Amino acid sequence: MNLNATILGQAIAFVLFVLFCMKYVWPPLMAAIEKRQKEIADGLASAERAHKDLDLAKASATDQLKKAKAEAQVIIEQANKRRAQILDEAKTEAEQERTKIVAQAQAEIDAERKRAREELRKQVAILAVAGAEKIIERSVDEAANSDIVDKLVAEL
């Protein structure tokens, strides 16, 4: 056999093999490759969507956290204002109660002082009468004794 005929036979066999492969082997391989490329592309797209969704969820969570912090701050401020208001009201009530108690105590003191003065006046009057009786018993001079009694009464 001649080398040219062998090469020609091999070339024809190779061409037939290539045609056979292109007709029967290549399409299923290409279909499998395209299917795999599509799956990979879908997976990448899904991962990208998931990443975007994660970013949106993070942004949403951050916004909600900021809103919650702002609401908490508002609630704290309102509570502080209410606390201050309650303290002011309590101070005002305590001051009014103190004033009322002091006024009652002062009134009781004044009443007790008046009662003591009246009691003292009564006792002084009794003593004055007793002294006057003793003076009268010693001397019957009413003019001299009445001056003394008048002076005692004036002092009261």
Curated annotation (Swiss-Prot):
It holds the Pfam family ATP-synt_B. GO terms for molecular function: proton-transporting ATP synthase activity, rotational mechanism; proton-transporting ATPase activity, rotational mechanism. One of its GO terms (cellular component) is proton-transporting ATP synthase complex. The chain crosses the membrane at residues 11-31. The keyword Metal-binding does not apply. F-type ATPases have 2 components, F(1) - the catalytic core - and F(0) - the membrane proton channel. F(1) has five subunits: alpha(3), beta(3), gamma(1), delta(1), epsilon(1). F(0) has three main subunits: a(1), b(2) and c(10-14). The alpha and beta chains form an alternating ring which encloses part of the gamma chain. F(1) is attached to F(0) by a central stalk formed by the gamma and epsilon chains, while a peripheral stalk is formed by the delta and b chains. HAMAP family: ATP_synth_b_bprime. Belongs to the ATPase B chain family. This is ATP synthase subunit b. It comes from Citrobacter koseri (strain ATCC BAA-895 / CDC 4225-83 / SGSC4696). The lineage of its organism: Bacteria, Pseudomonadati, Pseudomonadota, Gammaproteobacteria, Enterobacterales.
